[in-house]
Amino acid sequence: MAGTYSSTLKTLEDLTLDSGYGAGDSCRSLSLSSSKSNSQALNSSAPQHRGAAWWCYSGSMNSRHNSWDTVNTVLPEDPEVADLFSRCPRLPELEEFPWTEGDVARVLRKSVGGRRLPSFSAEAVRRLAGLLRRALIRVAREAQRLSVLHAKCTRFEVQSAVRLVHSWALAESCALAAVKALSLYSMSAGDGLRRGKSARCGLTFSVGRFFRWMVDTRISVRIHEYAAISLTACMENLVEEIRARVLASQSPDGGGAGGGEVSAEALEMVINNDAELWGVLQPYEHLICGKNANGVLSLPAYFSPYNGGSLGHDERADAYAQLELRTLEQSLLATCVGSISELSDLVSRAMHHMQGRHPLCPGTSPARQARQPPQPITWSPDALHTLYYFLRCPQMESMENPNLDPPRMTLNNERPFMLLPPLMEWMRVAITYAEHRRSLTVDSGDIRQAARLLLPGLDCEPRQLKPECCFSSFRRLDARAATERFNQDLGFRMLNCGRTDLISQPSSPGPDGVNTMDDQGLTPLMYACATGDEAMVQMLIDAGANLDIQVPSNSPRHPSVHPDSRHWTSLTFAVLHGHISVVQLLLDAGAHVEGSAVNSGEDSYAETPLQLASAAGNYELVSLLLSRGADPLLSMLEANGMASSLHEDMNCFSHSAAHGHRNVLRKLLTQPQQAKADVLSLEEILAEGVEESDTSSQGSSEGPVRLSRTRTKALQEAMYYSAEHGYVDITMELRALGVPWKLHIWIESLRTSFSQSRYSVVQGLLRDFSSIKEEEYNEELVTEGLQLMFDILKTSKNDSVLQQLATIFTHCYGTSPIPSIPEIRKTLPARLDPHFLNNKEMSDVTFLVEGKLFYAHKVLLVTASNRFKTLMTNKSEQDGDNSKTIEISDIKYHIFQMLMQYLYYGGTESMEIPTADILQLLSAANLFQLDALQRHCEILCSQTLSVESAVNTYKYAKIHNAPELALFCEGFFLKHMKALLEQMPSGSSSMAEAAKSRAWTHCRICRAP
């Protein structure tokens, strides 16, 4: 027993590497890590893992090679460890996710730099699609918790969630991908509603499905579209990162150009050996960071400044500094410490090292970062004490303090090593939480949130909106400023405690009284509105609080302002958290119902309270705000009545439609249209007369009320979001009001209805296709719309749906005639007088067809086609020169006679081919490789093609390799499909396959200049 205890203690001692704070072999570790020769020797003996180029073993690992052997070989094979993980809580298994295996396969097939990459097997794609679910759930859970603060999920919550879950390198890569997608989306404002979100962002995954998934999983009651774009881009980028690492392991040069198919086993081997991927893709609720499947700890590759280069002999000062950094690198892999002083020293040195290596924030220009360099983050004493609570090791405490004897018996079970994250991951997660709060200080709350994420079985409530949660460091302030800040904090705490009698006390929050703002840019009234403290709100109103004061932009005076909360008012906070009584109290006191939107310019846009209530689906709040004069179209108009140029703005109709709140949308539609003059663009002025004539011709069937131009534009945007997110009922309801279709909206609605097998809706959509203007037709109709409609044609059994599809195909084909089949002008190499046709005189070969003899001449046949030449040669070799009769089967005598007539006449000019024999002659011409005769038969078939014979002719053309005739039949199907379906509905499947293969070749929009 003593030996086991000694071995365990020795392993813990080596793993913690307390850098001289009492561990017996710390000096040995220090000397080993600074010796290049020793490190190289240990590197050569260490096992090499495939894919290890994506993360590196630091020198600290080399100095403890024996301890790592213990971790690698003993712990994973220990049944107790397997049993330990089996008891850990697991991530939920959800049924629906916003991608399919086909989507993942398309991302994996995307070329990089024009290079053709190896393909992934179907099993590898299926496995990767399943593993991605775990990464998505982790990011979504963290975004859900971060969104509690303001009851809204924006791109900032998603980006912080990605940084919490992924390593620094992966998170930075995902952030860059999100910035790229958002930039492309913003630059495609001119496309408006003509293209889908994914196409505008340059993404393969569906942004609309991700948005719908975020709504269905209730990440927040409000989802910003930029949040969905960011999450989509991050997940797609993760697939590309995994692909790059797998291909790098497959290729000898690491370039990913190796041949062969990537198997599921190769995929899993790379993931298991990658410390940045393995933990994220595990099924357990707690996040395993900095370890691979073997339990090997590692730091991020870019954290270490060493690339294997040698140091100069005369650079002693630099060598000493690098030695200190290498020792720090070892220490950051510690999973437990022996004293609070040791922990404080490690954290302090690590933060000092990280400040010099802080990467440029994605989306921030280098010039701006140079003008406003990031402030260093400090750790509060309570944060260090809380972190020490989770990293404390009783055995090491005894070694740190010789006067402290280890306990004879322990009351608590120690966490096994496999469940302990390294110190580096504790710091990474805690710093990310602090940065999300825009705080310069890591507090104990950040450590508790990190413990919940990193350790199994722990939980704590999300951060709440409180004044004390964003204190800046008082160390940077002089005595006077620090005293004022302490008094301000005391005033906020007094007002936040809920006692209304403290408002009149001398300790006011600041020089502005009850309108003083804290680091987050919030006033006491905003905090009271967020918490729903009606009594405190009333007292602050009576004390003269400004109801319409706005949250300022980020500044040194207010360093912790959340970017999305700028220009919010007290009414905004009350609406965000759904406190109806507080909203009514503020409105009764004179708060502006539109918040800050009326007095804000384009550069200070903020969502109105009605928009926030519409997104949340709060029917009572929407009704209250509408009754007080809130304008649902305010985001579509500026103060001068001009349409907003901020294309990312969503009006109230769009917010309710995007989140699927049908009852709220109906309530918004009951609001009477305000009599505001429409300001038209030049394009709208030129098109106004045409639109009015179209409207008058349609009559009143479009809807009961004539919509104004502004409301029509707003409702059309709402249709776009409802179609993108799969809310077909809302889309159809808006269409019933007379909102005109956009082609993309129609295609998305048709796709959703078809996938849900709602054929009644499909029928209505197909019937409404004729209302789409032809100038709306674009490439999407060819690549997506026709493909979808042909899929419906193949699977639908509804006669009405088939007839409507036929009408659409005929309409798309247009009135132009089917392109004719060109003749082949070919002169036969040899000719004989027609007198010798089937003439026994001078004949040197005889054919036996249907028991009848047919006399011919070799000189003509051998030069006519290779088929005849082969036939003659094989016959001579088999039977010798004595037998001159060649039997021809499967061809009728008169068909063979017409075939020979073509050869002896030298063409088709003098031939008369009966209509009933054309197909048989075509088959014979194809058999004997007479191309000109076959083409002539194809032309004759096209001239006699009818509704009754079209399907059979098409099948005959496919069997006998007549491509021009098959192409002509496909055009005939498109042009006469309605009549074809009426004549023979059983042939619809064949026609669907035929027309689908060449539909876009014939479609009118493709032939347009």
From Swiss-Prot:
Tissue expression notes: Highly expressed in liver, brain and testis with lower expression in the spleen.
Keywords: ANK repeat, Repeat
BTB domain span: 843-912
CDD domains to which the protein is assigned, alphabetical: BTB_POZ_ABTB2_BPOZ2 (cd18350), HFD_ABTB2-like (cd22913)
Source species, domain of life: Eukaryota
ANK repeat boundaries on the chain: 520-549, 566-595, 605-634, 648-677
Biological processes, Gene Ontology terms: cellular response to toxic substance
Gene Ontology molecular function, alphabetical: protein heterodimerization activity
SMART domains to which the protein is assigned, alphabetical: ANK (SM00248), BTB (SM00225)
Function: May be involved in the initiation of hepatocyte growth.
Protein known as: Ankyrin repeat and BTB/POZ domain-containing protein 2
Naturally occurring in which organism (per UniProt): Rattus norvegicus (Rat)
Upper classification of the organism: Eukaryota, Metazoa, Chordata, Craniata, Vertebrata
Gene behind the chain: Abtb2
